């Protein structure tokens, strides 16, 4: 009986540690927040890049139209602006292509996620095992108390 009480005491001592250990939950929330932030940010950045592409494209069209009608040094300046805008458009297109590339998580991050999932599964297994042990000990105690009570009734000749 003392052994069971000490086991229950040990389990009760571990309960606050198990209940108050929020690291797994907090890490999951941080990961979800970062993922949402990156997705939202990337969407807005891609939209801005498309707007820049449209603006640069329209400028290029306007510059090419102006350079066709221009004369003298103004035409040279427009030609130079046209090449610079073309380079800018190429840079924006390269940046868009780079933004579209799916980034995979690093192996270290994947290993950390796997380890976290394993720790969580182990924690849940241990928790379930602890619950079963406590429940079994309570059932055993109920049976012992019922036996003791029935023995006491027999000894005292009390009718049920």
UniProtKB/Swiss-Prot annotation:
GO cellular component terms attached to this protein's record: BLOC-1 complex; transport vesicle
Superkingdom of this protein's organism: Eukaryota
- Which Pfam family is one of those matched by this entry? Muted
| UniProt xrefs under InterPro entries | Bloc1s5
Q: What does this protein do?
A: Component of the biogenesis of lysosome-related organelles complex-1 (BLOC-1) involved in pigment granule biogenesis.
Q: Which family does it belong to?
A: Belongs to the BLOC1S5 family.
Quaternary structure note: Component of the biogenesis of lysosome-related organelles complex-1 (BLOC-1) composed of Blos1, Blos2, Blos3, Blos4, Dysb, Muted, Pldn and Snapin.
The protein, known as:
Biogenesis of lysosome-related organelles complex 1 subunit 5
* Gene designation: Muted
């Amino acid at each position: 009986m003392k052994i069971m009480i000490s086991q229950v005491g040990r389990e009760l001592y571990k309960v606050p540690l198990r209940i108050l250990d929020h690291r797994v939950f907090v890490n999951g929330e941080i990961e979800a927040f970062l993922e949402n932030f990156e997705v939202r940010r990337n969407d807005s950045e891609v939209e801005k890049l498309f707007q820049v592409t449209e603006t640069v494209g329209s400028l290029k069209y306007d510059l090419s139209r102006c350079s066709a009608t221009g004369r003298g040094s103004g035409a040279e300046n427009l030609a130079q602006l046209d090449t610079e805008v073309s380079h800018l458009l190429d840079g924006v297109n390269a940046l868009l292509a780079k933004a579209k590339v799916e980034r995979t998580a690093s192996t270290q991050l994947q290993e950390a996620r796997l380890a976290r999932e394993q720790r969580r599964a182990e924690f849940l297994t241990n928790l379930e095992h602890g619950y079963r042990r406590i429940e079994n000990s309570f059932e055993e105690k109920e049976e012992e108390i019922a036996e003791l009570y029935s023995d006491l009734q027999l000894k005292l000749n009390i009718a049920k």
